[in-house]
Curated annotation (Swiss-Prot):
A GO term, aspect molecular function: alcohol dehydrogenase (NAD+) activity
Residues holding Zn(2+) 1: C37, H58, C145
Source organism of the structure: Staphylococcus aureus (strain NCTC 8325 / PS 47)
Enzyme Commission numbers on file: 1.1.1.1
Keyword Chaperone assigned: no
InterPro entries: ADH-like_C, ADH-like_N, ADH_Zn_CS, D-isomer_DH_CS1, GroES-like_sf, NAD(P)-bd_dom_sf, PKS_ER
Domain of life: Bacteria
Gene from which this protein is expressed: adh
Binding site for Zn(2+) 2: C89, C92, C95, C103
PANTHER family named among the record's database cross-references: ALCOHOL DEHYDROGENASE 1-RELATED, VACUOLAR PROTEIN SORTING-ASSOCIATED PROTEIN 11
Name under which the protein is recorded: Alcohol dehydrogenase
Cofactor note: Binds 2 Zn(2+) ions per subunit.
């Protein structure tokens, strides 16, 4: 079967891989779609360590074509996800308290185990979340990581209906954060980016205000918008350092800043302001299986609509180049 495999020179090669036989608790999935995430770019570039030889992909959707004898949670024909959180231990303090993504023994698709950019994938059956029948599978691929990640981040922000939430970076993650916050949580949205096309897209999605933080002072604009109060919360999906610092600058006292994007850099934090204004800066890592079920359902109800563009597996290196150049709006999705 064909698979997108990381090479030593930080490229991706389309190779023929042979799968082993299923072990107890596993299922075999015929891949239909796999979204391309910025985390895939980090993995390819060895930003998190060298994983030469691994098959990329953690936004996979496909149909079960075989199950191990002991599997009861899935059956042949089920449409399921192949997500970043491929498997956790199920026993540690994190797994037993609803925080399974923080498990220290977690396995991640397309990073520590082979992922979904392949014609077939072996999955741990209990971690393959079923996709609602009325949800388009290509759109579901984007929800499998980008969607659940931003849905969880918006939940972590604690934003309430009618409050102001700032979304920094209106790319594959940010456009979904905007939709979950606006259409599910009932928040008012300020979209921040340095690309006018992406900001226009944010406006189409229902953003209440858009700010090009390259052309204007985002703090001054927010203060005008909120009667000098600041935003109630921010979610940062950007992959550059500057927006993370700006996300702290634009919030009010008692606000929460949720970090989601993964720039290879460090934030500059004004510690006195954090302390004196009681500002919380927290990280949010993808989402649990339950978060993914909820994220799928909201998408199936048309409250969230991922913008996807179908591509071929052979275009994967071109997609990564476009990603590095910042020219992608929405999500590139490989069709198998």
């Amino acid at each position: 079967m064909r698979a997108a495999v990381v090479t030593k020179d930080h490229k991706v090669s389309i190779e023929d891989k042979k799968l082993r036989a299923l072990k107890p608790g596993e299922a075999l999935v015929q891949t239909e779609y796999c979204g391309v995430c910025h985390t895939d770019l980090h993995v390819k570039n060895a930003d998190f360590g060298d994983v030469t030889g691994v098959t990329l992909g953690h936004e996979g959707i496909g149909k079960v074509i075989e199950v191990a004898e002991d599997v009861e949670s899935l059956k042949i024909g089920d449409r399921v996800s192949i997500a970043w959180m491929f498997e956790s231990c199920g026993r540690c303090e994190y797994c037993t308290t609803g925080r399974e993504t923080l498990c220290r023994s977690v396995k991640n698709a397309g990073y520590t185990v082979d992922g979904a950019m392949a014609e077939q994938v072996i999955v741990t059956a209990d971690y393959a979340v079923k996709v609602p029948e009325k949800l388009d599978p290509a759109a579901a691929s984007s929800i499998t990581c980008a969607g659940v990640t931003t849905y969880k981040a918006v939940k972590v922000s604690n934003v309430k209906p009618g409050q102001w939430l700032g979304v920094f970076g209106i790319g594959g993650l940010g456009n979904l954060a905007l939709q979950y916050a606006k259409n599910v949580m009932g928040a008012k949205i300020v979209a921040f980016d340095i690309n006018d096309d992406k900001l226009a897209f944010a406006k189409e999605l229902g953003a209440d205000a858009i700010i090009n933080s390259k052309d204007v002072d985002p703090v001054a604009e927010v203060m005008k918008l909120t009667d000098n109060k600041g935003l109630d919360a921010t979610v940062v999906t950007s992959v550059a350092k500057t927006p993370f610092n700006q996300a702290v600058d634009v919030v009010k006292a008692g606000a929460r800043v949720v970090a989601v994007g993964l720039p290879v850099d460090k934030m500059n934090l004004d510690i006195p302001r954090l302390v004196l204004d009681g500002i919380e800066v927290v990280g949010s890592l993808v989402g649990t299986r339950q978060d993914l079920r909820e994220a799928f359902e909201f998408a199936a109800e048309n409250k969230v609509t991922p913008k996807v563009q179908l591509r071929k597996l052979e275009e994967i290196n071109d997609i990564f180049e476009e990603m590095e150049n910042g020219t992608i709006t929405g999500r590139m999705v490989i069709k198998f």
